[in-house]
Amino acid sequence: MIKAGIIGGAGYTAGELIRLLINHPDVDIKFINSSSNAGNKITDVHEGLYGETDLVFTDELPLDEIDVLFFCTAHGDTKKFMDSHNVPEDLKIIDLSMDYRIKSDDHDFIYGLPELNRRAICHSKHVANPGCFATCIQLGLLPLAKHLLLNEDIMVNAITGSTGAGVKPGATSHFSWRNNNMSIYKPFSHQHVPEIKQSLKQLQNSFNAEIDFIPYRGDFPRGIFATLVVKCKVELEELVKMYQDYYAEDSFVHIVDKNIDLKQVVNTNKCLIHLEKHGDKLLVISCIDNLLKGASGQAVHNMNLMFNLEETVGLRLKPSAF
């Protein structure tokens, strides 16, 4: 059994990660660290786990007793922890924050998008889980980058559920504001754009276009629905074949020949992609569950690869659908 520890156990991504690991046939959770909830039952915070676990939050960190450590911490906290603690050299680490997503000589974390870096993830000890918007958008663009087709600016509109803002209440996550409402935030300046550009340049070294990304807040709890518009003269049939070939060995990305919607992916680790051609413009529609494929599900996917397991173990999940 893989012995797992979690640091930062009270948020939405941690709750989903705990749910996945409890039901994973090859994992035993040894501890869930939360300084604000130490001594409380997991079900005091994650009430959806009633009847599934008797685990209790702890403020202890028995790092020598585990094989893999997940960070579900606020941005900046993972780096602080790594800089201030003596972490066992053979301990595998999966960081769900943005601290190590950008390549640097200062760290050895691999960017954890399996559809881009599968082989490197399999041989890595340290993996930086991608952002939720970044995952959804990259999966819609990677096949184009591989074929060197991203030569003009890319227009992206993407709407996310309220869980994307985290568990801590705020003015824009309050029900009376969010319900029956929509708004944009961080237009052209979202923090996920640099990691998207980094990945596209990895496949298409000449990539130097702008990503004009407008994020939207949706009035639903979970999911990301993104539309990407790219100028492209290649015929639709050939483009569909490019996407199918690119994702042929990937279990969680599916090219669909008709319109897609969030209910087909919410509660799963899937990404669905639909393509349409309008003159010289290619419309790519990509949708995921922000808490699973965009966070905790992808983290478990990375863990499976790092421990040489079949990649879908513990991740065969039914979508909400209706």
From Swiss-Prot:
PANTHER family: N-ACETYL-GAMMA-GLUTAMYL-PHOSPHATE REDUCTASE, CHLOROPLASTIC-RELATED, N-ACETYL-GAMMA-GLUTAMYL-PHOSPHATE REDUCTASE, CHLOROPLASTIC-RELATED-RELATED. It comes from Phocaeicola vulgatus (strain ATCC 8482 / DSM 1447 / JCM 5826 / CCUG 4940 / NBRC 14291 / NCTC 11154) (Bacteroides vulgatus). It is found in: Cytoplasm. The keyword Cytoplasm applies. The keyword Metal-binding does not apply. One of its GO terms (cellular component) is cytoplasm. InterPro entries: AGPR_AS, AGPR_type-1, NAD(P)-bd_dom_sf, NAGSA_dehydrogenase, Semialdehyde_DH_NAD-bd. The gene is argC. This is N-acetyl-gamma-glutamyl-phosphate reductase. Catalyzes the NADPH-dependent reduction of N-acetyl-5-glutamyl phosphate to yield N-acetyl-L-glutamate 5-semialdehyde. Its main location: cytoplasm. Pathway: Amino-acid biosynthesis; L-arginine biosynthesis; N(2)-acetyl-L-ornithine from L-glutamate: step 3/4. Its EC number is 1.2.1.38. One of its GO terms (biological process) is L-arginine biosynthetic process. It catalyses: N-acetyl-L-glutamate 5-semialdehyde + phosphate + NADP(+) = N-acetyl-L-glutamyl 5-phosphate + NADPH + H(+).
